C-alpha cells in the first residue's frame, strides 16, 4: 500500500522520535506473513517487522517467507529506513540441528536487523560462528519461547551475548518495570496484542498429544480452542481413577459454575476455590468416548481457550517503564489485521510520547477486528474468568469486516479488488495511512460501467465512488448498529 501523504513520510524520517523528554518512543513491531503484509505494516506505522523460514520459525503453515522473500523483505525494509527481524525460534530435534547452520548462513549474509532465537544450542552455534568471523555480527534477540520471567535470567542471557530479550507474556507491568530497573542496558520487548497460548509462552503439548503435531515445531492445531463437553465424575474405589457418573437431568452446569464463582468472589479471591476438589471429565467433540479428567482451581482450567491479548491502554505505562519494543502477534492473520493494529498502536505510541491522553476510540477500532474477546493478560492481575473464553473456540467477526483493497482511483471512481461481499447501502470504512473515513455506499459498477446492487466477493473487481486521496487504501464494511466518527 503506497504512502501518499507528507505527514506519514515526515514521521517515517523521525526514527526514535520523542516529544516528551521523559518518554522514549518504543519501536512498533508487527508480524509479516507475506511481503504484502510487511508493506502494509510499514505503511500504517510499524518501525519493524518479523518473519522467518517455515522450517525454523514456528510457522510451518501459512508462511510465504522462503529465502527469496526474506532477501526482498530485508532489502525493502532498509530502503525505507525500517527494520526486519528474522524469526528462528524453533526448539529443534537432532535432525534440524544438523541442517540449521546450512540454512541460516545465507540469511545472516543478508544482514537482517536481528535473529529471534530460543534454543541455547543454536544460539551458541551462531555466536561461535560470529566470533570466528564466519558470519556477519547480527544481533540475537531471545524469543518469548525461552520463558524469561526474571532479571537474573536477563543478566545471564546478556553475558551470553544476546542483545534483546522478548519477555514472557506471563509478567505483570510491575514485574517488567523491576526487570528494567535491574537491567537498564538490555533491550526489552513486550507483546501487546494478539493470540494468547494457554501454555507457558507457547510450550504446549496438547496438539502433539491429540494429533502428533508438535507446537514447538511450528505445527500447532490449536487443540486448546476445540469444543469440549463437561461431564461429572466419581472416584473408582478400586483404582482411584475418575469415572463418569450419570448426570442428573436437573443439574444446571452454568448455574453451578456461577454459584461457585460468586462463592469464590465472596471470600476475596484468596481462599481455595469451592470447585477445587471436584473432578470433571472432558470429551472433545471429535473424540467421542475418550474422557479426560480435568480440574479447575483459583487459577482456571488447564485445557481452555484464552481470550486475545489487547494492551493498547497500557502503551503509555510500558513506554514510561522504558520498554524498547512493543510487539503484535499474528503472522498468519490477514493484511487487514496487520494494517489496523499497526495504525491503532502507532497512534497510541505517538499520543503517549506527545503527552496526549489515551484515546479510548482506539479500543473500539481494535474491537472491529475478528477476536475471541480481549484481555490485558497478566499485565494486570485479574480473576481467571477475565482471561478465558468459555463460550466459543473461534474468533468472532468483530464490528467491521474486511471487504476489499483499493487498487486505483481515476476520475472519482476507485477500482476495488473484492475480498468479501458488500452491497449498495452499506456503511463503509476506508482505512488509509493518512486517516480513515466512513461513508454510505451509493453505487457499485462493474469495470465496464454496468450498475450492480452488490459485489459478490472474491475474485470480483468492481468500481465505487471515492476520493483520489484514498488510493491504496483498504475497504471495510461496518456492521449494523456500530457508530463512530466519519474520519480519524
Where in the sequence are the language-model features?
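Conserved nucleotide-cofactor-binding alpha/beta core module
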Residues: 150-153
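As written
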Residues: 161-162
Amino acid at each position: 500500500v503506497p504512502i501518499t501523504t507528507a505527514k506519514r513520510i515526515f514521521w517515517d524520517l523521525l526514527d526514535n522520535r520523542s516529544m516528551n523528554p521523559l518518554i522514549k518512543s518504543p519501536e512498533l513491531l508487527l508480524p509479516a506473513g507475506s511481503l504484502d503484509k510487511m508493506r502494509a505494516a510499514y505503511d500504517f506505522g510499524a518501525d519493524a517487522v518479523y518473519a522467518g523460514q517455515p522450517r525454523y520459525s514456528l510457522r510451518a503453515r501459512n508462511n510465504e517467507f522462503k529465502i527469496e522473500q526474506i532477501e526482498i523483505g530485508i532489502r525493502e525494509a532498509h530502503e525505507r529506513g525500517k527494520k526486519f527481524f528474522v524469526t528462528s525460534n524453533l526448539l529443534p530435534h537432532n535432525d534440524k540441528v544438523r541442517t540449521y547452520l546450512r540454512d541460516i548462513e545465507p540469511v545472516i549474509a543478508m544482514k537482517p536487523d536481528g535473529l529471534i532465537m530460543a534454543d541455547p544450542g543454536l544460539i551458541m552455534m551462531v555466536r561461535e560462528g560470529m566470533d570466528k568471523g564466519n558470519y556477519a555480527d547480527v544481533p540475537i534477540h531471545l524469543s518469548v519461547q525461552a520463558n524469561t520471567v526474571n532479571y537474573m535470567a536477563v543478566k545471564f542471557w546478556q553475558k551470553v551475548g544476546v542483545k534483546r530479550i522478548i519477555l514472557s507474556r506471563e509478567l505483570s507491568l510491575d514485574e517488567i518495570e523491576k526487570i528494567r530497573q535491574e537491567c537498564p542496558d538490555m533491550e526489552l520487548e513486550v507483546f501487546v496484542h494478539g493470540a494468547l497460548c494457554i501454555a507457558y509462552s507457547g510450550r504446549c503439548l496438547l496438539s502433539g498429544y491429540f494429533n502428533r503435531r508438535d507446537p514447538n515445531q511450528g505445527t500447532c492445531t490449536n487443540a486448546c480452542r476445540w469444543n469440549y463437553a463437561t461431564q461429572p465424575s466419581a472416584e473408582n474405589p478400586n483404582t482411584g481413577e475418575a469415572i463418569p457418573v450419570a448426570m442428573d437431568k436437573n443439574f444446571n452446569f452454568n448455574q453451578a459454575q456461577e454459584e461457585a464463582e460468586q462463592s469464590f468472589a465472596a471470600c476475596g479471591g484468596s481462599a481455595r476455590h469451592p470447585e477445587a476438589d471436584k473432578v470433571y471429565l472432558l470429551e472433545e467433540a471429535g473424540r467421542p468416548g475418550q474422557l479426560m479428567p480435568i480440574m479447575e482451581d483459583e487459577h482456571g482450567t488447564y485445557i481452555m481457550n484464552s481470550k486475545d491479548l489487547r494492551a493498547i491502554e497500557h502503551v503509555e505505562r510500558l513506554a514510561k517503564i522504558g520498554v524498547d519494543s512493543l510487539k503484535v502477534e499474528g503472522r498468519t492473520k490477514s493484511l487487514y489485521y496487520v494494517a489496523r493494529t499497526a495504525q491503532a498502536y502507532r497512534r497510541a505510541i505517538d499520543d503517549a510520547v506527545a503527552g496526549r491522553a489515551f484515546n479510548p476510540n482506539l479500543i473500539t477500532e481494535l474491537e472491529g477486528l475478528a477476536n475471541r474477546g480481549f484481555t490485558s493478560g497478566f499485565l494486570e492481575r485479574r480473576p481467571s474468568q477475565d482471561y478465558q473464553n468459555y463460550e466459543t473456540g473461534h474468533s468472532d467477526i468483530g464490528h467491521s469486516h474486511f471487504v476489499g483493497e483499493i487498487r486505483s482511483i481515476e476520475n472519482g471512481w476507485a477500482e476495488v479488488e473484492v475480498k468479501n461481499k458488500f452491497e449498495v447501502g452499506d456503511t463503509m470504512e476506508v482505512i488509509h495511512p493518512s486517516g480513515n473515513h466512513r461513508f454510505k455506499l451509493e453505487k457499485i459498477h462493474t469495470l465496464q460501467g454496468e450498475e450492480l446492487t452488490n459485489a459478490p466477493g472474491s475474485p470480483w473487481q468492481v468500481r465505487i465512488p471515492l476520493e483520489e486521496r484514498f488510493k491504496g487504501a483498504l475497504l471495510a464494511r461496518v456492521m449494523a448498529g456500530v457508530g463512530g466518527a466519519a474520519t480519524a
